[in-house]
Each structure stands twice: as C-alpha cells, then as structure tokens.
From Swiss-Prot:
Species the sequence originates in: Azorhizobium caulinodans (strain ATCC 43989 / DSM 5975 / JCM 20966 / LMG 6465 / NBRC 14845 / NCIMB 13405 / ORS 571)
KW Electron transport (keyword) present: yes
Keywords: Electron transport, FAD, Flavoprotein, Nitrogen fixation, Transport
Family, per entry: Belongs to the ETF alpha-subunit/FixB family.
Transmembrane segments: none
Top-level division of the source organism's lineage: Bacteria
Name by which UniProt lists this protein: Protein FixB
One BP annotation, GO: nitrogen fixation
One Pfam family, short name: ETF
PROSITE patterns per UniProt: ETF_ALPHA
UniProt binding sites for FAD: 299-327
InterPro entries in alphabetical order: DHS-like_NAD/FAD-binding_dom (IPR029035), ETF_a/b_N (IPR014730), ETF_a/FixB (IPR001308), ETF_alpha_N (IPR033947), ETF_asu_C (IPR014731), ETF_asu_C_CS (IPR018206), Rossmann-like_a/b/a_fold (IPR014729)
Amino acid sequence: MSEPTKAPAASAGSRAATKKELPEHFKAYKHVWVFIEQERGQVHPVSWELMGAGRKLADKLKVELAAIVLGPDDEATQHAAAEAFSYGADLTYVVADPLLTDYRNEAYTKALTDVVNTYKPEILLLGATTLGRDLAGSVATTLLTGLTADCTELDVDADGSLAATRPTFGGSLLCTIYTLNYRPQMATVRPRVMPMPEREEKPIGRIITHPLGMVEDDIVTKILSFLPDRDSAKSNLAYADVVVAGGLGLGSPENFQLVRQLAGVLGAEYGCSRPLVQKGWVTSDRQIGQTGKTIRPKLYIAAGISGAIQHRVGVEGADMIVAINTDKNAPIFDFAHVGIVTDAIRLLPALTEAFRARLSPHSRDRIAS
C-alpha cells in the first residue's frame, strides 16, 4: 500500500540535545489559543474546526482553551466572541476597533502580538487561509518564535511540547516539527483537515477585552473601497457533502464534462486531481489534494484518479470514497471504501442517467444538504 511515511518522532532524549532551558519569561506561557478568523461578520469554519483540535490539546495539557477575536466594535464581533463558547472555549479575548473592520496586516499583527505578549499563550493556532497564512507569518516573525505551516496532525508529547505534523518532500514524508525553545508554539491548519466539532449551546463565559493601541496614521495600508466577490460559480468544494472528481484517466477535457454532469445530477460539487489543473483542463479552485483543497464529504466519487499520496491527503477524511479506475493496482483502491475496476468514461454516463431517473430535483437537493 502506498502511503506517506511518517518520520519517527525524535525521542525525548534526542530532543534534549537541542533543547535549552526555557528562559524564565517563557515559563509563564500557558494555555491554548485559537485565532477566530472573521471577515465582514462571517466566521471562517476553519476557526471552529481548530477549536475542536485546540480543545483536545488543552485537555491533554490540563490548561484552558481560549479564542482570540479581532474585528470592529460591532454586533458581529461580539457574536463571534460569544459563539466560541459553544465550540469549547473557556474564555475569549477580544480586540474590537474600527481599524480592524477589514484585514490589514499591520493592524492585525499589532493586535494579536500585543495580546499574546500580555496574556502569554503556550500554543497559538490559526487557519491556513489566505488571511491566516499572512497573519501567522508576520506574528511569528514579530514574536521571534517558530511556526509550522499547513499541519495535518497536532498533538502534545510526553514533555508537553506541541508536536505539529505536516507533509514534506512532495507529500512522500510526514515530518513532526517542534518549537522547543521559544513561545508561543504556532501552527496553521488548512480548512477541513480537522473535523468540525459538535456545537453545544453554552452560556457565555469570560470575555477579556484589550485595546488596539494604534491609530490610522500608524497603518501604511489604506482601504479605498471594498468590492465583494460576485463570482457565483466559485466552488464550495471544501465544505461540500458530495464531491465528484476526475483525473488523467478521463483522457481529455471533453470527457471531464462527464464528471460535471454527474455532479449536477447529484447536486454535488466537482473537483479534479493536480495534473488536470496543470494541463489547463480545470481551474485551480477545483483542485483536490495536498496543494489544493482538503475535503471531508459524506460521499466522494473519484473517476480516473490514480490516488497518489498528494491526492490521498486531501480526501482521506471522506465518509465514503468510491473509486473508478481501469487499473486494479491503482493506489486509490488501497484507501477507497468501494472500488470499481472499469472505464470511467463508460460508467459515468450510466451513473448519471440512473441517478437522473431515480432522483427528483427535491431528492438531489436533499442529498447535497
């Protein structure tokens, strides 16, 4: 079976050779924090996914889990702060200021680093989104600490250090990285890598507010206008319940339309493997895998996809994987729940017609919801 090899984690003894005694001021750093990403009043779902992961880390360390919310002083920011308790937060830190209405690196970096320096978290987690990646890098640089990006697994070892695992060497190796001598220990995680925790209605707990300590003249970046994305065809691939995807085994861009047709009948999103994006058959926002989207659908149908390691890491969280491939030895059959050895070009139209005959439009909506 072809799967990424996990490099053996360094033993406590081998890490001791590189681990210095933590400076006295770092010993005061406790608790796990999750940055709650919101834009225009909408919280990115990866924030709640990270709350679930953060809750597990905090429980292992026997410390508190805190959310950190930055935004304008409005109802949406206060709602995000309160909602964090429903996803496991013990307390929430809030920096609310008109200067934080739209994301600007200078203001957000100042706000987050000030709160970190004041309240001293041991672990700080952010989503590996466009905003999160930009912010995490500048915050880690400002704090002079380490950052592990695009993690696929988070844990704490026997010493209580964050063990952040991520793919490396083109996805052929999983490497566990430690920040041994600095605090906070920072990591980013892509959307849908971690499962969404169950939301539980809970009373609002402690909310601690902190001032921004910045004025408009301190910020080089200026917001001239805001133009919302009006691309109605933009994919919601990462959060779709049903996904149909195609790979090189389909042979041509014309045959890829068979994937789109089946997805349309099922009320599903469609995606592809990396080679199709490289060939220009499909746009990059539809790519699934290590360098594309990570998905966790209830049903994933993969047609003509070999299932290389880089693709596997993006789909193995799916509840049900149905693989269609002419090669019975294709790696995708090692992790698919259902494998069909046949030509996808012949099977896809038959599936489309069968589902079209059996499913009313109402039924298709129900499958995709």
